[in-house]
Regions:
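Extended, small-residue-rich solenoid/repeat segments and analogous flexible loops
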Residues: 1-118, 123, 128, 133, ...
């Protein structure tokens, strides 16, 4: 039998615990999915460097979350709220961001290669030096977005 492992998700601004999950062999992915299933408020959650590759995050409220350098490759983020999220250097390769709200998100240096951004709201997002190779941007709102680099 493995040992019980507790993982806490903290607010990036206040440091307060917004969700805690304990189970045998726990991972950050299981903790985030548990938080979403239980309707926890992940607004401003600090998930810096988290491995959420392949996770089902459809409709998740990650408004203002710190996902800097997180691995979201292949994740399902359809209709997720990522307004003002810090996704600097995040790996979103082959992620499904269809109809996601990425208004004012920091996507500098993010890898969006092959990502589905169809219908995504990228108004005011910073995509400087982001890799958009083979990304689907059909019907995406790029007004005011920074696409330099």
């Amino acid at each position: 039998m493995g040992s019980m492992k507790s993982i806490k998700i903290r607010n990036r601004w206040t440091g307060s615990v917004v969700f805690e999950y304990t189970k045998e062999g726990n991972t950050i992915t299981e903790t985030v999915l548990g938080a979403i299933r239980r309707g926890a408020d992940l607004h401003g959650a600090d998930l810096c460097g988290a491995d959420l590759s392949g996770a089902d995050l459809r409709g998740a409220d990650l408004h203002g979350a710190n996902l800097r350098n997180a691995d979201l490759s292949g994740a399902d983020l359809r209709s997720a709220d990522l307004r003002s999220a810090n996704l600097y250097g995040a790996n979103l390769c082959d992620a499904n961001l269809r109809d996601a709200n990425l208004r004012d998100a920091d996507l500098r240096g993010a890898n969006l290669c092959g990502a589905n951004l169809c219908g995504a709201d990228l108004y005011g997002a910073d995509l400087c030096d982001a890799n958009l190779c083979d990304a689907n941007l059909r019907d995406a709102d790029l007004r005011g977005a920074n696409l330099r680099g």
